[in-house]
Every structure is written in C-alpha cells, then in structure tokens.
UniProtKB/Swiss-Prot annotation:
Purpose: This is one of the proteins that binds to the 5S RNA in the ribosome where it forms part of the central protuberance.
One Pfam family here: Ribosomal_TL5_C
Domain of life: Bacteria
Sample GO molecular function, one term: 5S rRNA binding
Basic and acidic residues bias spans: 8-20
Subunit composition and interactions: Part of the 50S ribosomal subunit; part of the 5S rRNA/L5/L18/L25 subcomplex. Contacts the 5S rRNA. Binds to the 5S rRNA independently of L5 and L18.
GO biological process annotation, one example: translation
Gene Ontology CC annotations of this record: cytosolic large ribosomal subunit
UniProt protein name: Large ribosomal subunit protein bL25
Assigned keywords, A-Z: Ribonucleoprotein, Ribosomal protein, RNA-binding, rRNA-binding
Record field: compositional bias (Acidic residues): 192-209
Origin species: Bartonella tribocorum (strain CIP 105476 / IBS 506)
Family from the record: Belongs to the bacterial ribosomal protein bL25 family. CTC subfamily.
Alphabetical list of Gene3D superfamilies matching this protein: Ribosomal protein L25, beta domain, Ribosomal Protein L25, Chain P
Amino acid sequence: MSKSYTLKAEKRERVGKGSSRELRRNGLIPAVIYGEKQPPLAITVPYKEIFYKIHAGGFRTTIATIVLDKQKIMVLPKDYQLDPVRDFPLHVDFLRISAKSVVEVNIPVHFLNEDTAPGLKKGGVLNIVRHEIECTAPANAIPEAIEIDLSSYSIGDSIHISAVQLPKDVTPIIQDRDFTIATIAAPASLDVSDETSEQEKDEGETQTS
C-alpha cells in the first residue's frame, strides 16, 4: 500500500466555471468530497500538490487525509479531470471513507522479469490487454500494484486472472469469466507452430545426446 498523505483544504462557497477559473489562477483546484451517506462537500486543494500526486502515479489507490478547519477527513481519490491540451488538473473527486471501508479501485498491473521470460527472449511480444484490474479491497490495505511474474511464460501463452495471486481480501470485480490480462504474442516472422516445432527439435536433440 502506498504511504498516505495529508492535504490542507478550504471550504468552497462559490461554484461554477467562473469561480473555478479564478481558483486555478490562485493556485487552487476545485474538488468535492462525497460518500459515507453525508452531503457532498465542496472544497479547494493546492494545485501544486495535486499535480505532483497525480503524475507520480498511484493517486487513485492512495488514501489521503484532508484537513478542513479542525476536521480531518479520510478520503480516497476516485476521479480527476485534466486539461486536454496542457495536462494539468482541473477538478478532483474524493470518496469519504473509514478504516473499515471496502472500496472499488483500479489497481495497476506491473509485469516482472521481462528479461528472463522465455517467450520474450525468443522474440515474442508482451501484448497487455489490461493495464489495470478493477477490484474491491479494504480501504486501509489497497495494494500499489498487482505483480505478474513473466519468467515462466512462452510464446502463445495467455495470462488469465486465475493465474494471478491477489493480496488478501482483494477480489476482482469481474467474477463471471476468467478474463485475460496479457498474452505473449509471436513476432510477425514467427508463429506459435514454429515455436512448438523448435521446442520439439530441441527436445529431440537432447534425447539423442
């Protein structure tokens, strides 16, 4: 789980595009806190801190504590809006949570040992079907990433969710099928049948020797 952090915030009395533009000119970002059966709370948070948190990665899987006046609110960033041209944050949605909350999160997938994967060493290509997996997880134990070891995969292999060891109490949202996360695809000059023939040839030479 990523290390939590604290954000200082202020209540936002005015809403609307004009007010939001003025806030951004003053180094602030409009945001809202919702959830836990409480009314939505309009706030502002520092632009610079949000910018760096978003672009550092793991923003939507890391718990934050928002300090508002004398109140401390535990939240999980659920969504954010970026400027389509300049890529700076425009707005953030925070989900209010508690220590016992179970939340839905998109957890990034990290692939390990690409340099030793048999299929990749023979020229195969890692075709990533899902860069993230939507899961439910305890709010206080959200993993930074789901790690998949490629060291045993060959050309033509598919990696399904059933082959992945998920952390305790982390469950994929999709339950009705064994969905694919990635495949090791053959390069244009080599198909799977060629790879199989090569393996059989190697095995035959080994037995002969």
